[in-house]
């Protein structure tokens, strides 16, 4: 949509578009790389490893930085090198051997042309949110199916559950079929919505970050589930419970599908995070009641 004199609504749209135009112009100066067949795999690997790296550093520092214990989901667990390297190796192997040929085939058939204009900010944000909700729905159905059908679980999903305690690099420790399914849903949604390339980049970055955060093993005050109100978002402790109990919390991000199907289970509050100030292992809701009772006693 070009910017021209018109209604106030059109002017507002142009203003929000102009907010993103400098960023989009910068990306377009590197169009030769962004349109190359190696870009999707390179972008995915760098983004994923880049998001995992801070948590790997925290795990290395954890024994010598006591304050980190307050935010660790499993205070007595820290991944070893023997756990980290196979996870990283499997991610690199699958992206290079399986994902790259698929993206190469797509590039040969339909090389993308980058538009000159950036998307409107409201459009970008709304499309990213819709893509996240669609992805959450699709993975919930896929995930539930692969837990309810024993053959599917043993053949395709069991690999991801080999690490019962979460850590960042275990996020993509999965079978090729599971990685292919996630990639398919990831690409399908942006294609159906005909998203702008900048929206696609943004969605992929956010999606990778949320998945890494869910497996990071750390629950910080700025974690996503603390920023989203009304318990709509599960978060790291929520997903960690799925890894420990298997029969609950199947949605990757949001909680509405698990609520509707009765598979939602409140995440236990780690001892070091308890708001009541004691070494409590109650759920978040019960801990809130515990805290109120403690205030009344004082």
UniProtKB/Swiss-Prot annotation:
Ranges for domain Fatty acid hydroxylase: 128-263
Positions occupied by motif Histidine box-2: 157-161
Tissue occurrence: Widely expressed at low level and at higher level in the lung. Weakly expressed in the heart, lung and kidney.
Entry's transmembrane regions: 38-58, 88-108, 124-144
Pfam families per the UniProt record, alphabetical: FA_hydroxylase
GO MF term (any one): iron ion binding
Highest taxon above the source species: Eukaryota
Phenotype reported upon loss of the gene: Mice do not display any apparent alteration in bile acid synthesis and cholesterol metabolism. Macrophages however display impaired mitochondrial metabolism, due to increased cholesterol that triggers cytosolic mitochondrial DNA release and subsequent activation of the AIM2 inflammasome.
Post-translational changes noted in the entry: N-glycosylated.
Glycosylated residue positions: 5, 163
Catalyzed chemical reaction(s): cholesterol + AH2 + O2 = 25-hydroxycholesterol + A + H2O; cholesterol + NADPH + O2 + H(+) = 25-hydroxycholesterol + NADP(+) + H2O
Family to which the UniProt record says this protein belongs: Belongs to the sterol desaturase family.
Name this protein carries in UniProt: Cholesterol 25-hydroxylase
Organism of provenance: Mus musculus (Mouse)
